[in-house]
From Swiss-Prot:
It is a multi-pass membrane protein. The dihydromethanophenazine:CoB--CoM heterodisulfide reductase is composed of two subunits; HdrD and HdrE. It catalyses: methanophenazine + coenzyme B + coenzyme M = dihydromethanophenazine + coenzyme M-coenzyme B heterodisulfide. The keyword Transmembrane helix applies. This is Dihydromethanophenazine:CoB--CoM heterodisulfide reductase subunit E. It comes from Methanosarcina barkeri (strain Fusaro / DSM 804). Its cofactor is heme b.
Amino acid sequence: MSEEMLYFSGLSDVLRMTFVQIMIFSTIAIVIFLYGLISNFQKWGTGVTGYALEPQEGKKGSAITFLKTWWSQVTAESHHRGESILEILILDILFQRRILKRSPFRWVMHLFIFGGWMTLFALSGMMFAVEMTEKIGIALPFTPAEFRDFLSIPNYIFGYILLIGVLVALVRRLFVSEVREASIMYDWVLIGIVFLVTISGFIADGIRTGFIWSFGLDPSVAPPAALFHSIFSLLFCIAFIPYSKYIHIIAIPLALLANKGGE
């Protein structure tokens, strides 16, 4: 078995996080996320009895009934739109053509935020898969530490893509009058959280490597800086999603698939 990979996060250089500790924090975040997601499914399914059936007043929402009804609507034949599920996934959900038609500038901003966020999430999932594979004893042609180093460049690239998207969103809210007037404090808090998550990641990495974002801080604070970024990201980029307006990253794709597209 390969040598244990040293994690960047910790209370100090000596007290680094272990794989088990990271899995505990991750599991807590995922459980909170799933509880909120199921609660939303129950809320959306209130009164639902089935696809094409009349709602039943006072009927308690069921997540299973909601998902069954949603899937029946997704797979039902449409007479006004003939788009396939694959076409909707690519054009409406990934490419976000509805936003492009309304505003190309806003589309670029959304694509940077959505693409950066989801790609970084996928890269983290790949890292987790490699670690789990190594933990259960399956031989790989590389170690988890080598794979983490391999992912460093994509992480930098999509981290900056996310940062650019967030900065554009902040500039729009500050200097575009109609956007500023339509924004409430809750909107500012949400975009501020994403900005803090993104910046804290760059700063934690900069302190550790001494590259650009270190701000002259002592390298000894690199582990707690990385720990702050990790816990903050788990809380607000996973656990918090179903309880905030960011649930739209799940709700909108579900609606687009059920309604056979967004054109």
